[in-house]
């Protein structure tokens, strides 16, 4: 049983690292106010600079004005132990990570049909400041698309996120 728990925790950390990387646009190991602003705005929110600064302060243990992975991991662990909004315990250790992945998937799946098309992927990448050619977007879809339908479903998305962390 302990071996299963360790594996789940390792998988969860890998999922959290991928979520962290989604925010950490320049890959320097910390989430700045500007990076947080970019992602939050891509989710359709319009926070003030003060609200963004407060979000960072809430988790910035070392007080340096950015969120490092350890601080992000601590935040995710606290969320998981609270069991989310339903008040449940933290026994379902994969639930928080699964919910994070589902939220990330929803960002890409603009029409909420359960599939990410090349056009949806292109739109999100542009809104995040990524400049990709049509060929690069299509290549990303081909690499993730296991069933060959030209789109990425949730299971393919999860697999892609897990592989990109290795």
From Swiss-Prot:
Has UniProt tagged this entry with the keyword Nucleus? no
In-chain residues carrying the UniProt-annotated modification N6,N6,N6-trimethyllysine: 131
Instruction: Report whether Zinc shows up as a keyword of the record.
Output: no
GO cellular component terms listed in the entry, alphabetical order: cytoplasm
- Read off the InterPro entries from this record: CALM/Myosin/TropC-like, EF-hand-dom_pair, EF_Hand_1_Ca_BS, EF_hand_dom
Q: Where is the EF-hand domain?
A: 11-46, 47-82, 96-131, 132-166
Give residues annotated as binding Ca(2+) 2. Answer: 60, 62, 64, 66, 71
Please give the SMART domains that the UniProt record associates with this protein: EFh
Record's superkingdom?
Answer: Eukaryota
Binding site residues for Ca(2+) 3: 109, 111, 113, 120
Sites where the protein binds Ca(2+) 4: 145, 147, 149, 151, 156
**Annotated binding of Ca(2+) 1, by residue:** 24, 26, 28, 30, 35
Q: Which UniProt keywords apply?
A: Calcium, Metal-binding, Methylation, Repeat
One GO MF term on file is: calcium ion binding
What this chain does, per the entry, is described as:
Potential calcium sensor.
PANTHER family assigned to the protein according to its UniProt record, in alphabetical order: CALMODULIN, MYOSIN LIGHT CHAIN 1, 3
Q: Which family does it belong to?
A: Belongs to the calmodulin family.
Record-given protein name: Calmodulin-like protein 5
Provide the gene name from the record: CML5
């Amino acid at each position: 049983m302990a071996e299963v728990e360790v594996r789940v925790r390792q998988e969860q950390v890998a999922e959290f690292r991928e979520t962290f990387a989604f925010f950490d646009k320049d890959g320097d190991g910390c989430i700045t106010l500007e990076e947080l602003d970019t992602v939050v705005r891509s989710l359709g929110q319009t926070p003030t600079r003060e609200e963004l600064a407060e979000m960072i302060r809430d988790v910035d243990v070392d007080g340096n004005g950015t969120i490092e992975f350890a601080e992000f991991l601590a935040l995710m662990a606290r969320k998981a132990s609270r069991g989310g909004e339903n008040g449940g315990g933290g026994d379902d250790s994969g639930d928080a990570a699964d919910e994070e992945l589902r939220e990330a998937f929803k960002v890409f799946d603009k029409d909420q049909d359960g599939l990410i098309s090349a056009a949806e992927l292109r739109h999100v990448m542009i809104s995040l400041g990524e400049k990709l050619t049509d060929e690069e977007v299509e290549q990303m879809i081909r690499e993730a698309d296991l069933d060959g339908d030209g789109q990425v479903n949730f299971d393919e998305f999860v697999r892609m996120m897990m592989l990109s962390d290795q």
